[in-house]
């Protein structure tokens, strides 16, 4: 039976509703992992390092999609909760058109800047050529990639999370099958990986575009709209935390690469790339839960249902806390086989990766609480507070930690810097939740 945003959510009903979003994010991470797995084993560690070096730049330019998706869907869900369906649809249409326009501009910019940015990141020789080549090809699909991120949020708001999951699975399977064909069978190496990524992202972005452009059973259909500068401003403010998360992550990943290159060279970048791929799968559970539950929070906030807000917050904090314990234990158990699958062909790289992941995975214990805390305030249309949490978590604390800890603990200081940043952010998140309880009445 279809679950509606207006219902009271038990644990069972809440997990049923967010499950497609969690699976969607996990699957998105998995096909990214498969991409890296094929490149590492068939194209070599230089090509693998190139992807990890240029990826922060790609993700930085695509951050607009995350901002519009999370910030815009929160506003649209709140508008639905207030009973203004026509206005909600016009806001939706305007945001999609803006994403397309912005994506085209950023795609051109990315293609032009791929080589100079790679040089600035420290690439040279074959590493520079690989970075430039991969970046220029994948920037061709930046617009549909941004659309995919926007539509996945709106699928949940439209009470169609299963359809969003289906689109991601279709895009992911396309990417993985083409990875196998282009890299393993036809020997196209890094070019094959880039083309496979482009094809998968085009499906992920254009299939939802066609769905919402045609007559459908959701509350939304692309159509005529107006220019709503206030809604755009509110979307940017509301989604600023997600924008900050992606931009900051790109900056931090670049800084990690610099530090690792300084301490252990190219092997450090390859090891960090492996850890990040696996990390994406684990934290995808938190991001999927946050994406899936945010429209529920926004709807009940718009409907002024304070009792349900309290119910959602309590259940969500318990869920993310318990998940953190299980994920930490699982990560410790699978560290060795995962490192062997990715980089088992190089003994030194294998040991570096395994050791680094066992330290890094301690962050799973607490990062879910911070991810949900930031998302919760976005859903409450408090983008500034959400952005503050994200800014401190992904930039200030992580940058400080990765610069300071290696002075005392060398390479282990790099691996443990994220844990310190998450612990400091947890204190900030707890203070924000306690301080704002009288405003939102969730306690």
Describe each PLM feature range.
Residues 60-63, 175-180, 205-209, 280-284, ...:
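Hydrophobic transmembrane alpha-helices of multi-pass small-molecule transporters
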Residues 69, 137-156, 167-175, 193-206, ...:
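Short runs within selected transmembrane alpha-helices of multi-pass transporters and secretion channels
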Residues 35, 72, 113-114, 151, ...:
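Hydrophobic/aromatic residues in alpha-helical transmembrane segments
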Residues 6-43, 56-71, 75, 79, ...:
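N-terminal transmembrane alpha-helices
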Residues 48-108, 145-164, 271-335, 367-389:
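Small-residue-rich hydrophobic transmembrane alpha-helices
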Residues 30-48, 118-125, 181-188, 250-281, ...:
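Helix-terminus/linker motif at the lipid-water interface of multi-pass membrane proteins
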Residues 16-35, 137, 148, 171, ...:
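Transmembrane helical elements of multi-pass membrane transporters/channels
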Residues 1-18, 76-141, 185-240, 297-363, ...:
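Short alpha-helical transmembrane segments in multi-pass integral membrane proteins
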């Amino acid at each position: 039976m279809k679950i509606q945003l207006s219902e009271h959510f038990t644990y069972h009903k809440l997990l049923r509703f967010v499950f497609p979003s969690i699976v969607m994010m996990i699957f998105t991470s998995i096909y990214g992992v498969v991409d890296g797995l094929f490149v590492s084993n068939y194209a070599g560690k230089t090509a693998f390092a190139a992807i990890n070096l240029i990826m922060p730049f790609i993700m930085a330019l695509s951050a607009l999609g995350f901002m519009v998706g999370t910030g815009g869907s929160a506003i649209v869900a709140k508008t639905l909760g207030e009973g203004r369906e026509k206005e909600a649809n016009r806001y939706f249409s305007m945001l999609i058109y803006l994403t397309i326009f912005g994506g085209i501009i950023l795609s051109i910019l990315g293609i032009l800047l791929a080589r100079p940015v790679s040089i600035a990141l420290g690439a040279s020789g074959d590493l520079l050529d690989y970075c430039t080549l991969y970046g220029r090809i994948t920037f061709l699909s930046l617009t549909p990639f941004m659309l995919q991120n926007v539509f996945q949020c709106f699928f949940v708001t439209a009470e169609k999370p299963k359809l969003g999951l289906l689109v991601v699975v279709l895009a992911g399977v396309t990417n993985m099958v083409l990875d196998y064909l282009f890299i393993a069978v036809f020997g196209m190496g890094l070019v094959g990986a880039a083309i496979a990524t482009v094809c998968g992202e085009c499906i992920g972005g254009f299939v939802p575009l066609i769905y919402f452009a045609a007559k459908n059973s959701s509350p939304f259909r692309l159509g005529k709209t107006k220019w709503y500068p206030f809604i755009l401003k509110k979307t940017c403010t509301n989604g600023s935390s997600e924008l900050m998360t992606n931009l900051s992550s790109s900056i931090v990943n670049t800084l990690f690469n610099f530090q690792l290159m300084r301490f252990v060279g190219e092997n450090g970048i390859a090891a960090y790339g492996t850890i990040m791929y696996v990390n994406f799968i684990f934290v995808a559970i938190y991001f999927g839960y946050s994406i899936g539950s945010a429209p529920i929070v926004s709807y009940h906030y718009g409907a002024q249902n304070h009792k349900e807000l309290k119910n959602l917050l309590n259940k969500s904090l318990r869920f993310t806390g318990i998940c953190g314990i299980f994920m930490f234990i699982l990560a410790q158990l699978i560290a060795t086989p995962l490192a062997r699958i990715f980089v088992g062909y190089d003994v030194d790289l294998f040991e570096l990766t395994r050791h680094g992941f066992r330290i890094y995975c301690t962050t799973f214990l607490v990062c879910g609480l911070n991810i949900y805390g930031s998302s919760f305030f976005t859903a409450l249309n408090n983008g500034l507070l959400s952005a503050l949490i994200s800014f401190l978590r992904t930039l200030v604390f992580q940058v400080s930690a990765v610069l300071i800890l290696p002075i005392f603990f060398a390479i282990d200081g790099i691996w443990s810097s994220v844990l310190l940043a998450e612990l400091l952010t947890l204190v900030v998140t707890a203070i924000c939740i306690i301080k704002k309880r009288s405003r939102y009445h969730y306690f």
